């Protein structure tokens, strides 16, 4: 049997009508024999969708295996304490999903993360419709997906410069626990992502969603039923090897549980997130500012608070021939909770924490090895994070230090 014939036999399980035509073509060109083609056909298994309207199905997968070593030391009330450290391997993400296209611009996407708990295993689940007219071009989404708030949050986790998201990003976007805000991340609702055909580089988006993230099928018991309204706008410019994008994201809800999903304090939140991105000659960087005006958000939920944060991140890729690319990466993050409070576990994933602080900062330095781009990537990084002050007194002489080493291997398919 020819080499091409053997390769075709190995892929027989994916045959369909188009593959039959391909086999006939290979026979007519003399690449394989008719007997070889018939043998491949006998061993093939047709995989077809249940509904006839489905035109194609695409498999989506991601596997991330991570090592983490996390050490936290707290200095509070005149004492120093080393908290229980972490030194383990974890399956960080195990995504498996599908995208089905039905024609006429309609599609549906469902992705599950088997590394999460059974209560929050959905990554995405939404229906989409492509729309294109003279003055209206974009895509409508209905379902569970990420809002456009906090650059690092809505950037795919497979494309992060760092292994985990930053102190400030996690504080603004992770689930509301009475300290974190829960503004970004995944919400159930209606989304529109559009562009202006007459103005190249100008994009925008709007969404109306539940105000609580990470709850795809219902809002938490006792939650306020008011919605969250979000919008974004950006302009991108590309000149040869240089591209730059500037934009701003906005979110507002007139009623969410600022005391956490189990709390009883419902109030309004307005959040803004201007940002800038730059790519030039191997350098890739971004920076954003996060700010939220929250009613009844601190001091036993009796006073307003204005948390704010800053992120700056960059990496530079060096080609190393057949071995891919190597990219040193750095990130700085700063957070001021304005008295709402933050624990180390709020900003550093899987860190242990006991004391609540006022503000904090972190520095990350690492190396990314793009063996086959993001499809096959290894990351190694160190992060130092420090929180200081007391929740109700930013000048209090107390702080917490975290030293974190992580390594992660990633495969996309």
What are these regions (language model features)?
Residues 5, 11-13, 138, 194, ...:
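Small side chains
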Residues 184, 221-228, 264-268, 275:
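Short, contiguous, pocket-lining structural segments
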Residues 49-214, 223-241, 245, 250, ...:
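Outer membrane beta-barrel
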Residues 82-83, 126-133, 144, 240-413:
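Outer-membrane beta-barrel pore domains
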Residues 44-45, 118, 295:
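Short secondary-structure boundary/hinge segments and terminal tails
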Residues 2-64, 71-73, 413:
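N-terminal periplasmic/intermembrane-space "pro-region" immediately following the signal or transit peptide
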Residues 218:
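Exposed aromatic-hydrophobic patches
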């Amino acid at each position: 049997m020819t080499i091409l014939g053997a390769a075709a036999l190995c892929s027989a399980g994916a045959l369909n009508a188009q593959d039959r035509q391909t086999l006939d073509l290979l026979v007519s060109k003399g690449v394989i024999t008719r007997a070889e083609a018939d043998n491949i056909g006998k061993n093939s298994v047709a995989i077809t969708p249940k509904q006839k309207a489905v035109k194609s199905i695409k498999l989506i997968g991601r596997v991330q295996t991570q090592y983490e070593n996390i050490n936290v030391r707290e200095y509070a009330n005149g004492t120093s304490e080393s908290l229980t450290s972490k030194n383990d391997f974890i399956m960080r993400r195990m995504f498996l999903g599908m995208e089905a296209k039905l024609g006429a611009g309609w599609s549906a996407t469902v992705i599950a993360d088997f590394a999460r708990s059974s209560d929050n295993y959905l990554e995405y689940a939404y229906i989409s419709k492509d729309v294109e007219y003279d003055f209206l071009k974009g895509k409508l989404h209905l379902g569970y997906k990420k809002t456009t708030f906090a650059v690092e949050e809505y950037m795919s986790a497979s494309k992060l410069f760092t292994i985990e998201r930053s102190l400030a990003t996690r504080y603004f976007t992770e689930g509301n626990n009475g300290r974190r805000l829960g503004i970004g991340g995944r919400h159930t609702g209606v989304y529109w992502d559009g562009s202006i055909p007459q103005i190249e580089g100008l994009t925008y988006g709007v969404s109306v969603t539940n105000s609580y993230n990470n709850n795809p099928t219902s809002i938490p018991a006792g939650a306020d039923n008011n919605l969250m309204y979000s919008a974004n706008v950006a302009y991108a410019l590309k000149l040869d090897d240089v591209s730059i994008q500037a934009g701003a994201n906005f979110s507002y809800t007139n009623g969410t549980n600022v005391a956490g999903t189990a709390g009883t304090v419902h109030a309004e939140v307005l959040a803004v997130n201007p940002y800038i991105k730059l790519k030039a000659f191997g350098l890739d960087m971004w920076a954003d500012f996060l700010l939220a005006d929250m009613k009844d958000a601190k001091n036993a939920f009796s006073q307003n608070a204005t948390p704010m944060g800053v992120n700056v991140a960059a990496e530079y890729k060096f080609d190393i021939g057949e071995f891919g690319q190597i990219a040193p990466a750095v990130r700085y993050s700063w957070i001021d909770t304005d008295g709402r409070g933050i624990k180390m576990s709020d900003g550093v994933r899987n860190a242990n924490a006991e004391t609540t602080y006022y503000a904090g900062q972190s520095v990350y330095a690492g190396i990314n090895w793009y063996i086959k781009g993001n499809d096959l990537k290894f990351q190694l990084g160190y992060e130092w994070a420090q929180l200081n002050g007391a929740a109700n007194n930013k000048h209090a002489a107390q702080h917490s230090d975290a030293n974190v080493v992580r390594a992660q291997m990633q495969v996309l398919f």
